[in-house]
Swiss-Prot record:
It comes from Salmonella paratyphi A (strain AKU_12601). Homotetramer. This is tRNA U34 carboxymethyltransferase. It comes from the Bacteria. Belongs to the class I-like SAM-binding methyltransferase superfamily. CmoB family. Keywords: Transferase, tRNA processing. GO terms for molecular function: methyltransferase activity; transferase activity, transferring alkyl or aryl (other than methyl) groups. Pfam families: Methyltransf_9. GO terms for biological process: tRNA wobble uridine modification. It is an enzyme of class 2 (transferase). Its EC number is 2.5.1.-. Catalyzes carboxymethyl transfer from carboxy-S-adenosyl-L-methionine (Cx-SAM) to 5-hydroxyuridine (ho5U) to form 5-carboxymethoxyuridine (cmo5U) at position 34 in tRNAs. It catalyses: carboxy-S-adenosyl-L-methionine + 5-hydroxyuridine(34) in tRNA = 5-carboxymethoxyuridine(34) in tRNA + S-adenosyl-L-homocysteine + H(+). Carboxy-S-adenosyl-L-methionine binds at residues 91, 105, 110, 130, 152-154, 181-182, 196, 200, 315.
């Protein structure tokens, strides 16, 4: 059973304590009413993993845990089998005592693009919206964050996160809650808020930006990463039924348009930090994610387009400050 009591105890002692007015009731309702049909199977996989304290833990350059002496073949097989019960693994990679989880996305590449543009994370309290399996939460801790909180309603991601946490010695510096941003009150408590790979899934992108702003302290930093298209500040792509085979893509602005949106929501010091085309090396099918991936979503005769004829995915990172 995945419990959240440690997180409640943690925030009861800090500036997030007012979250306890709503959070426990929301989690209790989720536990009663909203659990996925496979959640018991997934949580059992987490429960059956061994409790290991790493001899060496690297969160600065990767998410890697090592033991002082190599694990036995039987121990490795047990860990490998249980982690494979949590497939598909989309965000990573992870290297855990010799079990290497080769995820669909090279999320470490994204982190390498984002990190140089951030304010120093040392001592910061961070919120990561739509955090997936929590890979970037661990990298935030590695970069010096005091506390990294992720929210993502996808319950498989919660179990993947808890599996990794258990294999990292039950590290309590990062936490994942099975919530969406719309379920959070205006906490105004986080020094840095990340929203990476979320905005284009929102029917009202400006509302999402306001929700992110409501989580930041004054002078806090927003890190926004999302799909963009080429164009000026008035360019926005509104796909039809699908974009790169995804049904839930609503608005893809140009980077200049996105900058304008942020300014309209009251953010200041907005800058476009990075724009890059997503490659089939960064997002691809692996033995830990065996279904279709980016290569299947691009026009086989023109890789600059999706199968629907839209511009192929490119992603921008924008940094902004709450005034």
């Amino acid at each position: 059973m995945i419990e959240f009591g440690n997180f409640y105890q943690l925030i009861a002692k800090n500036h997030l304590s007012h979250w306890l007015e709503t959070l426990p009731a929301q989690i209790a309702a989720w536990q009663r009413e909203q659990q996925h049909g496979l959640f018991k199977q997934w949580s059992n996989a987490v429960e059956f993993l061994p409790e290991i304290t790493p001899w060496r833990l690297d969160l600065l350059h990767s998410v890697t845990a090592e033991s002082e002496t190599p694990l036995s073949e039987g121990q490795l097989k047990r860990i490998d089998t249980l982690l494979r019960n949590l497939m598909p693994w989309r965000k990573g990679p992870f290297s855990l005592y010799g079990v290497d989880i080769d995820t669909e996305w090279r999320s470490d590449w994204k982190w390498d693009r984002v990190l140089p543009h951030l304010s120093d994370l040392t001592g910061r309290t961070i919120l990561d919206v739509g955090c997936g399996s929590g890979y970037h939460l661990w990298r935030m801790i590695g970069a010096g964050a005091h506390l990294a909180v992720g929210i993502d309603p996808t319950q498989l991601f919660l179990c993947q996160f808890e599996a990794v946490r258990k294999l990292l010695g039950n590290d309590q510096r990062a936490h994942l809650l099975p919530l969406g941003i719309e379920q959070l009150p205006a906490l105004k408590a986080f020094d840095t808020v990340f929203s990476m790979g979320v905005l284009y899934h929102r029917r009202s992108p400006l509302e999402h930006l306001w929700q992110l702003k409501d989580q930041l302290v004054n002078e806090g930093e927003l890190v926004l990463e999302t799909l963009v298209v080429d164009g000026d500040e008035n360019t926005v792509l509104v796909p039809g039924d699908r974009y790169a085979q995804m049904r839930n893509v609503y608005f893809i602005p140009s980077a200049p348009a996105l900058k304008k949106w942020l300014e309209k929501c009251g953010f200041v010091d907005v800058r476009i930090a990075d724009v890059c085309v997503t490659t089939t090396e960064e997002q691809c099918r692996t033995e830990w994610m065996v279904t279709e991936s980016l290569a299947d979503f691009l026009d086989p005769n023109d890789r600059s387009k999706t199968v629907e004829g839209y511009p192929a995915p490119q992603r921008a990172v924008l940094i902004a400050r709450k005034r």
